[in-house]
C-alpha cells in the first residue's frame, strides 16, 4: 500500500517544524475551533463510575437522536432500532463496508467511486481484495458521477458503489436527478449504494445538499460524521443509516471486530445530533474563513472549482506546473497544502 496522504502531510509539517519555519497548515481538515462546551460537558457527564462494554449498534438514546436528526434535516424516517448504527467516525465505516459486502471471488467483485476521491474508498476495496473502478470526475462532467456514462459490464460487476456529495475535496453537490438515477440503477444491478455525506451540513452556496435516503432506502446506506460538523475529530463519532438488512449484516461484522464507540463519546454524540445551534455557529466561522481565501485566490488569479460545500477549496494550479510541484513551492515558505494527486490520478 502507498503511504496514506495525510501521513505525508504530517511528515512535511514535522520537517518544517524541525527547521523552525512557521507553518500555515491548509492541508488537513482538522478544525482548530474549540469543541462546543455543551458537547464536552455531555462527554464528562457520560463517564460513569463503572465502565462496561458499549453496545455494538450504539446506545438507544444516540440512535434515537440520529433518527430525529434525519427526520428534521431531510424528512427521512428511519427506525432507530433497525436502521441506524453508531460508528467510530466515518473513515473506519467506509473502510469496512467493502470488507463486509464484497464477496471474492465472485462475479460481483468491483468497488466503484468517482475520482478525485477520499483515499479510503480505494484502500478499503484493496483490503477486501476487490477490483477498483475509479471514474474520472472533472470540469467536463461537473464532478458529477453519472451511472448512464458507465459501461453496463462495470455496473453488473459492481458490488459496492460510493457516492460522496458534497464532494471531498471539490465541494460540488450532486443534482437530485442523479441521486434518483443512481437509486434506479442500483435496483437494476443489485449493488450496495453507499453515500458518504460527511459534509452535508457544511454548505455555503446554492440549494442545501441532499441525502441519498431522501430518494431511496432499499440497498442504500448513508454515512455521517461529527468530525467537522461538530468539531469532534478527536472523538471519532459518526453513524451509518439505511436498509435494515444491510445494517443487520454490518452489525454482525462489527460485533466480531469490536469497534463500538465508547459510551461517553456516544453521550456527547447524542447531544450533537440533537442540538443544531452549534452547527450554525461553526458554519458561520467556516464561511468567514472561506470568504477570505476566495478573495485571496481571486487577487492571485487562482481559479477555484466548486467549493459550494465542505471544508476545502479545490484550486487549479497555474499553467506550466502541476499540483505536486506547486505544493512543494508553497511548502518552501511554510504553507502546507494537499496536492490533487493525493485524491487520484491526473488530479491537478
Cite the ranges covered by each PLM segment.
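N-terminal small-domain helix-loop-helix segment of the aminotransferase-like
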Residues: 2-89, 93-96, 272-274
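Conserved C-terminal alpha-helix-loop-beta "cap" of PLP-dependent enzymes
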Residues: 14, 303, 315-348
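Helix C-cap/helix->beta junction micro-motif
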Residues: 16-19, 128, 188-189, 300, ...
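Conserved core of the PLP fold type I
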Residues: 51-184, 201-202, 207-216, 221
Amino acid at each position: 500500500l502507498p503511504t496514506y496522504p495525510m501521513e505525508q502531510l504530517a511528515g512535511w509539517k514535522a520537517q518544517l517544524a524541525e527547521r523552525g519555519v512557521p507553518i500555515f497548515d491548509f492541508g488537513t481538515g482538522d478544525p482548530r475551533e474549540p469543541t462546543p462546551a455543551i458537547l464536552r460537558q455531555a462527554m464528562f457527564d457520560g463517564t460513569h463510575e463503572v465502565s462496561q462494554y458499549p453496545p455494538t449498534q450504539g446506545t438507544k438514546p444516540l440512535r434515537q437522536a440520529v433518527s430525529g436528526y434525519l427526520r428534521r434535516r431531510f424528512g427521512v424516517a428511519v427506525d432507530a432500532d433497525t436502521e441506524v448504527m453508531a460508528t467510530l467516525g466515518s473513515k473506519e465505516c467506509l473502510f469496512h463496508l467493502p470488507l463486509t459486502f464484497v464477496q471474492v471471488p465472485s462475479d460481483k467483485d468491483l468497488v466503484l467511486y468517482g475520482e478525485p476521491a477520499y483515499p479510503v474508498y480505494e484502500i478499503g476495496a484493496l483490503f477486501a481484495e476487490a477490483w477498483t473502478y475509479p471514474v474520472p470526475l472533472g470540469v467536463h462532467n461537473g464532478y458529477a458521477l453519472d451511472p448512464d456514462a458507465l459501461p453496463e459490464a462495470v455496473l453488473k460487476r459492481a458490488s459496492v458503489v460510493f457516492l460522496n456529495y458534497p464532494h471531498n475535496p471539490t465541494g460540488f453537490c450532486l443534482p437530485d436527478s442523479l441521486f434518483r438515477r443512481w437509486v434506479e440503477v442500483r435496483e437494476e444491478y443489485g449493488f450496495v449504494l453507499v453515500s458518504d455525506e460527511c459534509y452535508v451540513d457544511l454548505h455555503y452556496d446554492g440549494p442545501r445538499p441532499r441525502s441519498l435516503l431522501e430518494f431511496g432506502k432499499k440497498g442504500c446506506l448513508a454515512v455521517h460524521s461529527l468530525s467537522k460538523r461538530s468539531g469532534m475529530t478527536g472523538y471519532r463519532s459518526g453513524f451509518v443509516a439505511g436498509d435494515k438488512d444491510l445494517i443487520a449484516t454490518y452489525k454482525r461484522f462489527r460485533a466480531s471486530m469490536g469497534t463500538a464507540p465508547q459510551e461517553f463519546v456516544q453521550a456527547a454524540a447524542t447531544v450533537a445530533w440533537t442540538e443544531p445551534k452549534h452547527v450554525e455557529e461553526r458554519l458561520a466561522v467556516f464561511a468567514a474563513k472561506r470568504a477570505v481565501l476566495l478573495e485571496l485566490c481571486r487577487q492571485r488569479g487562482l481559479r477555484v472549482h466548486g467549493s459550494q460545500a465542505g471544508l476545502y477549496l479545490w484550486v487549479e494550479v497555474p499553467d506550466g506546473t502541476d499540483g505536486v510541484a506547486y505544493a512543494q513551492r508553497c511548502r518552501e515558505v511554510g504553507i502546507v497544502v494537499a496536492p490533487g494527486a493525493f485524491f487520484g490520478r491526473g488530479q491537478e
